[in-house]
């Protein structure tokens, strides 16, 4: 299940980025919900909030390590744990989605722009964020279950 989730995220991420790159000019902004949500063709050579700009080798190494750890966790820790499988699949898909951009373009295509100063993001970023949140939720649930079983 984790690998299926990852493949779906990678496919959606790459399809949406391809649509942005082929259908929008760099810097073009299309309102979806005025003052709230926009499609905005943007490129990022760093991470969220513009940190680590141009540090591609750093991202290559870190992403490779993260992907390896996630695959290890899927194979060893996620058996029988649906929430953990989904969480790890989301993180894996998000990590690989942005990794593909860095390998092919030397930058990441971002296009979801919300109100305020929130960073522009993409499907891979969303999957990573949701996956990490579900991973943390799983840790809390497992801790609570272990606490109950020792009573």
From Swiss-Prot:
GO terms for biological process: proteolysis. The keyword Protease applies. Keywords: Aspartyl protease, Cell membrane, Hydrolase, Membrane, Protease, Transmembrane, Transmembrane helix. It holds the Pfam family Peptidase_A8. The active site is at residues 110, 125. Its EC number is 3.4.23.36. It is an enzyme of class 3 (hydrolase). Pathway: Protein modification; lipoprotein biosynthesis (signal peptide cleavage). InterPro entries: Peptidase_A8. It is a multi-pass membrane protein. The chain crosses the membrane at residues 54-74, 83-103, 120-140. It catalyses: Release of signal peptides from bacterial membrane prolipoproteins. Hydrolyzes -Xaa-Yaa-Zaa-|-(S,diacylglyceryl)Cys-, in which Xaa is hydrophobic (preferably Leu), and Yaa (Ala or Ser) and Zaa (Gly or Ala) have small, neutral side chains. GO terms for cellular component: plasma membrane. One of its GO terms (molecular function) is aspartic-type endopeptidase activity. PROSITE patterns: SPASE_II. It is found in: Cell membrane. HAMAP family: LspA. Belongs to the peptidase A8 family. This protein specifically catalyzes the removal of signal peptides from prolipoproteins. NCBIfam families: lspA (TIGR00077). This is Lipoprotein signal peptidase. It comes from Shouchella clausii (strain KSM-K16) (Alkalihalobacillus clausii).
